[in-house]
Amino acid sequence: MALSSLVEFVILVVKNPCYQQDDASSSIQEISISASEIASWDMSEILSYGSVKVRAHRTRLIQESSYFHGLLSGSFSESGLDHISVEWNLESFLNLLMCLYGYDIEITSSSFLPLFESALYFGVEKLLSICKNWLSVLASSNDNALPKVELSDLIQIWSFGLEHAGEFVPDLCVAYLAKNFMLVKSDKYFGNVPYELLMWCVKHPHLTVHSEMDLVDGLLIWLDAGGRLSDLPESSQDNTINLMEQVRFSLLPLWFIAGRSKSHGFSKFADQSIELVTKLMKMPSTCLVDSLTDGPPTDVRVRLTEYSEILDLSGCPQLNEASLLLSILPNSYFANLRWRKSLESFLKNPDDDERHQEQISHRTLPILSFESVKEIDISKCQRLDYKVVIKCFSKSFPSLRKLRAAYLLNIKVSTLLELLLNFRELTEVDLTVDVSPIIPVQASVFYSGQGHCLLSSITRLTLEGRSDICDMELRSISRVCESLCYLNIKGCALLSDACIASVIQRCKKLCSLIVCYTSFSENSILALCATISMTNEHMDINSVASNLQTLHMSKCEGISETSLLNLITHSQKMKSLCLRDTKVSDSVLCEFPGSTLEALDISNTTISWMALARVISRNPNLKTLKARGCKNLLQLEVDGRTDNFSPLVSGQEVFKCLSKGSGLEELEIGWGFSYFSFESLRPAASFLRVISVGLGASLGEDVLKLLPSTCPLLESIVLHFQEISDSALTSVLTSLKHLQELALSYCFGEISLQSFKFSMPNLRKLRLERVTRWMTNDDLLVLTQSCPNLTELSLVGCLHLTSDCQPIISAGWPGMISLHLEECGSITENGVASLYGCIALEDLFLRHNGSGIQKSFLLDATLKFPMLRLVSLDMCDAKEGGFDVPEEKEEGRSLSIVKISRCKSDRCSLGRRAAPMHRETLVMLWNGQTLTKTLLKQRL
């Protein structure tokens, strides 16, 4: 029996080569276990030993492992031994034995390589198959719940597989990296990815990115890592070029190309990319199809894979419906030599009747379906034919949940209704456009001229700025959107109070309502506060107001105090409340019953510290407070009355209340805010990201110097009428590494160029208004070097700037999106041709900078700045006394609002021209259907 037992079993003496004995531990560093008792193994205890004796079945080892088959059944001397020594990673070997005996083992990102290496070395096909299957599933599955492979582990797996495991492991690593590119490009180890692995990933058909710019960003991150872009040898330069040549430059947004034009890895391609995009913007869909060569037109096809969940095409005016169609057709479609003819037939007949159109599309266009796509952004893609787009999207993206189509003037309400009919699972739509500067109830107008279906699943609808939407159209939308939870109609000036009330009555699930700059008034409040009646013999005593979590009603006038009080007292669940520029009073705000408020805006109201303190004390989770322009915050007592809460409430006590909460993230304040207020606020300010201080506050230099240490996370600083100095500004700009916005308006004190000589690569927005009178062209050049990534710049009162600063701006900030220049010397004395280098401009404000702007500027600007939406000019700067206006019906236009100011031409007693005084403003508003011209007294 003993001899039989020796033949049947073998003792494996497994020693961990990496084991380090602890002198303080027991002298016994070996443990004996049996493979027959795997179920009772205590792995944590076993792994604490440096050596393990495992009693295993000889036959099973021979059958399951080619290594032990050769060792125990061949001619090796060990074949007759009952003890076999094995030097291997202890945990990996024990897991291998468990696999041999049919037990499940857990594979993780970190354990895969040791297990795979063990399986290869010991020749265990079962474990090899398990490892391969695990990696295959992760490389091909759409299940987001599956574990992730850490990038550092993936690199090691790929390198090992390349050397030892043939093709399948490297191929799966490449596939995994391609599928998860959006995730791994922000990984700290992304710079360690070998060139070959990255190149194979970029070329892989499953490369999944939200947009082409995400791919470029990833490549630039990789190139920047480890100083790859400095002193490159010729071979590395070739690698860089090879990588960047995989980018589809025709799909990049203009602002992105311009903004990256100074990046070392991208600069060689920037000019040709802009030239290509500009060429495509002028090319109709049918011409684009005609220009393509045989085979799949890779360079103009949007990257879409079975793993795509988000498609971001925003900011690409060069895209037309042909580009999208080419992207959702299979490669096999382009094998047919007649593919151009069938595609052109579809593009030329978008207005055919529905039945005929369906026949054409099904017969000639085998459109692919990408069921994983949940979100699409086509904002600022104004050349798209939305009839074609909707038909194709409805077939290709059946699971679409969110659609953002902002700043598109050619999308009508009828288009929206068609969207709702074609996308049954759509829950969120954003059709935002620029809010008109004309508020009918405020403007002093001289003259003005013109122009039952199934329910939708829409829960969020944004119509901000859609001044073309009237009562009838919003009612039509609400009839199919009864499940609305979020509605944004900010700036929809044509809507009546009665219409808004009707929508509220129909959409009983509303919990977020944005109605700023509308006619929202008495009727709407009655609808919000009315009891909701249900149909199934059930009465819900709650009102819509009682379920509201967000209500923004800035500049809504004509609301009585009684109605406002009724609304406030019903809003116990409110989280975000905006009462800016309303008639809200202390007595109304004090009745606010909520305790979950996270954001409160009472700017430009008569609210005092007393009422504010009452609200803050009841809402400890307040994260955003906006209270600029509240002059009553200076008063300690209101109307001589006392209150049960406190007869005298100071700002310091209010900020002490804030300090008891979870911490402020955003603060806008003015009257009554001082050094002592800030001291009281300091415990609550450590998480502050945004601070805006306006008229009536008195921070002083000391507070500015405290900002970096007190608020290290600050991203935005806006100061109006505050005392500043070089030392304070230097402290802020050198210490706040997250700062993205700096605005100094009408501040006093001495600052110089020294404050701006520090590197600020993260700064995106800079406003210097009446604070840098000394600025010269050379100073501006220094600013372009210190802040190379600015996208928004506003300069006011820089009297020494000349027209020579235009090329400085264009070359220094080619990706500029918003540019405001007012009373800046003679910048436009010789025209504005040198500004055309800022090709991505969307917002341009030029006023009192020199009378050299050509009469044709507006016409030229729409061509030179294809993304331009907002323009503000002044007749004082017109070279020929006026400006030509673009045609009313211009296809694919993005320009929506033009403001032209005129000044009085008064002269002083000595015959010299006096300082210009505003007289009137002509506002031209294109809403996608009509061009409206309005002449106002106000300066906008």
Curated annotation (Swiss-Prot):
Cross-referenced Pfam families: BACK, BTB
CDD domains in UniProt: BTB_POZ_ZBTB_KLHL-like
Pathway(s) the chain acts in: Protein modification; protein ubiquitination
Domain BACK as annotated: residue spans: 155-258
Residues covered by the BTB domain: 41-109
Keywords of this entry: Ubl conjugation pathway
Domain of life: Eukaryota
Record InterPro entries: BACK, BTB/POZ_dom, Leu-rich_rpt_Cys-con_subtyp, LRR_dom_sf, SKP1/BTB/POZ_sf
Gene Ontology BP term (one): protein ubiquitination
Note on domains (UniProt): The BTB/POZ domain mediates the interaction with some component of ubiquitin ligase complexes.
Function: May act as a substrate-specific adapter of an E3 ubiquitin-protein ligase complex (CUL3-RBX1-BTB) which mediates the ubiquitination and subsequent proteasomal degradation of target proteins.
The protein, known as: BTB/POZ domain-containing protein FBL11
Organism from which the protein derives: Arabidopsis thaliana
